[in-house]
Swiss-Prot record:
Taxonomy of the source species: Bacteria, Bacillati, Actinomycetota, Actinomycetes, Micrococcales
Gene: pyrC
Organism: Leifsonia xyli subsp. xyli (strain CTCB07)
Name by which UniProt lists this protein: Dihydroorotase
Positions bound to substrate: H60, L61, R62, N92, N278, H309, F323, G324
Keyword terms, alphabetized: Hydrolase, Metal-binding, Pyrimidine biosynthesis, Zinc
Residues annotated as binding Zn(2+) 2: D152, H179, H232
SUPFAM superfamilies listed in its UniProt record: Composite domain of metallo-dependent hydrolases, Metallo-dependent hydrolases
């Protein structure tokens, strides 16, 4: 329970209305005009949006095992900087998060850090090897209460194993989050397959490698009657398959990353490994289809796929470089530039695709709720009129492998509140936060 009190004055909500907010005891105690409270810290929100804390269903925090890239502490600091109050941590750690013990360790690390709620994602298969199911039930029954399972970074390519996983998690309303990539079609692939990959002499990554797995898995989900979530959709064909599945009544949800909403394969022409990512940057036609799919509800959410790497893993030849980009700090600005400034989505839509719906998919209570009296004090203040050149100084985690460095981005997170505590004030991540436990 928070013992900090804040009065936020003149904030604009997602529906366009203006209000003051009184935060105390870890909740939004009151909304209205000219609010005050003894001893409260007053935060002037004139011209700022007050939005529900963002929820990222797809984050790589790297701990345990890869602390040179990121830790739960540094990753959640990056999350707070981007307006996130809750993140789901992918399982590709060392040891892999395929047991109750490892997911409980990740949960405890998040509680100790205090910058955001951390919900571990459990591996689907032991060691992410795709050979036998991990301890799905034990992770679901653990203190971490895991409900999302993924081998992200690898595809559950065996259809029988995927069927069994869908059947297993159905018993406790879990969901399989599939990294849709047929490995036999993408062996050695380095960028999107097309004319440009031929010109650059880089092995191509065909769209059908993603689309074929999604087509298979939506049919499996329909057969089993279980929930399926598709990670980082990147092609127009994938949007078509998901749209067809939803029209058929299949229980499938899907995410798109900020970078796939903005960046295209042409950026690879300079062989700058900051633009090397899995799935790869695609054609402008794919970007347009992804934006349209998000706008019409075919794609349910935006998720960052925040993937930090040490400098040496990116500052090298393209073929040797690691796949992945950092994205927590820049996510909302990129989404604003892609679909808000272009008139495709409004701020109420942003609250839905970056907060309410990811919380619902992850079965997370107390997050993604509207900014209103009685709700948990999980929110952030955002200046949509700001514009700035994105720089490494804005990166609060360990990773500096951002594709947006030196780009002009819209908007800026001014303050973030988690469990009623401030984690960001005046645009800066606080060095210590009151919400830490353990």
């Amino acid at each position: 329970m928070s013992d900090e009190t804040f009065v936020i004055t003149g904030a604009m909500l997602a529906d366009g209305s203006r209000t003051d907010l009184l935060l105390a005891g870890g909740r939004i105690q009151e909304t209205g005009v000219r609010l005050s409270a003894a001893g409260a810290t007053v935060v002037d929100a004139d011209g700022l949006l007050a939005l529900p804390g963002l929820v990222d269903l797809h984050t790589h925090l790297r701990e345990p095992g890869y602390e040179q890239s990121e830790t739960v502490l540094t990753g959640t600091r990056a999350a707070a900087a981007g307006g996130f109050t809750e993140v789901f941590a992918m399982a590709n750690t060392s040891p892999v998060a395929d047991t109750a013990g490892v997911v409980e360790q990740v949960l405890s690390l998040g509680e100790a850090a205090g910058y955001a709620t951390v919900r571990p994602i459990g591996a689907v298969t032991v060691g992410l090897e795709g050979e036998r199911l991990a301890e799905l039930g034990a992770m679901a029954d653990s203190r971490a209460r895991v409900r999302v399972f993924s081998d992200d970074g690898k595809c559950v390519s065996d259809p029988l194993l995927m069927r069994r996983a869908l059947e297993y998690v159905k018993a406790f309303d879990g969901v399989i989050a599939q990294h849709a990539q047929e490995p036999r079609i993408t062996a050695g692939a380095q960028m999107n397959e097309g004319a440009l990959s031929g010109e650059l002499g880089l092995a191509g990554w065909p769209a059908v490698a993603e689309e074929s797995i999604i087509a298979r898995d939506v049919l499996l989900a329909e057969h089993v009657g279980s929930r399926l979530h598709v990670c980082h959709v990147s092609t127009a064909g994938s949007v078509d398959v998901i749209r067809w599945a939803k029209a058929r009544g299949i229980d499938v949800t899907a995410e798109v990353t900020p970078h796939h909403l903005l960046l295209t394969e042409e950026l690879v022409s300079g062989y700058d490994a900051r633009y090397k990512v899995n799935p790869p940057l695609r054609r402008s036609e794919d970007v347009e289809a992804l934006r349209a799919g998000l706008a019409d509800g075919t794609i349910d959410i935006v998720a960052t796929d925040h993937a930090p790497h040490p400098v040496e893993a990116k500052d090298c030849e393209w073929d040797a470089a690691a796949f992945g980009m950092v994205g927590l700090e820049s996510a909302l600005s990129v989404v604003q530039s892609s679909v808000v400034d272009t008139g495709m989505l409004g701020w109420a839509d942003i609250a839905r695709v970056l907060s309410a719906t990811p919380a619902r998919i992850g079965r997370l209570a107390g997050h993604g709720t509207p900014v209103e009296a009685g709700a948990p004090a999980e929110l952030f203040l955002y200046d949509p009129a700001a514009a700035r050149e994105f720089s490494t100084g804005e990166l609060a985690g360990k990773g500096v492998n951002s594709p947006y460095l030196s780009m002009t981005l819209s908007g800026r997170v001014v303050a973030t509140f988690h469990r009623g505590y401030a984690t960001v004030l005046d645009g800066a991540v606080l060095e210590s936060v009151g919400g830490a436990r353990g």
